[in-house]
Curated annotation (Swiss-Prot):
SUPFAM superfamilies with a match to the protein in the record: alpha/beta knot
Annotated function: Specifically methylates the pseudouridine at position 1915 (m3Psi1915) in 23S rRNA.
Main subcellular localisation: cytoplasm
Protein name: Ribosomal RNA large subunit methyltransferase H
Amino acid sequence: MHITLLCVGKLKEDFLLLAQKEYLKRLSPYARIELVEVREESLPASGRAGALEAVLKKEGTRLLERIPDNCVTIALDRKGMMLSSKEFAGYLAELGLRGQNKLCFIIGGSAGLAGDVLARASLRLSFSKFTFPHQLMRIILLEQIYRAFKIIRGEKYHL
């Protein structure tokens, strides 16, 4: 399986970079993971009407340009569908059975994702009603993808 993580912004903190490196290593026997980062816009300091929408539009344009061809697109969205780890594993397994082996997960920036990016997604996925920093969400997503492959293969998983 080929999985693209399309993310707004770069990881800067060492602990997040180490966690990302660890999960990419753990995932290497199961899937080819490609990280694609697009530039994050600065959020406006003022509450000027339309400023947030302008940020979403700029980031959204960058994201849409980088979505690989012929892939199943999954946008992380706090208003999306919530799945258990087993349900998520089942979803990935079903995609594989249907021959859909190219996936693209999209993680927005601080402002979230533009409506046109959400509309492009085959699935809008939520991990919780909580709001997480988008940098941390990347690590949580990698962990859940790893857990899903362990579930699919019937392998034990303990950290």
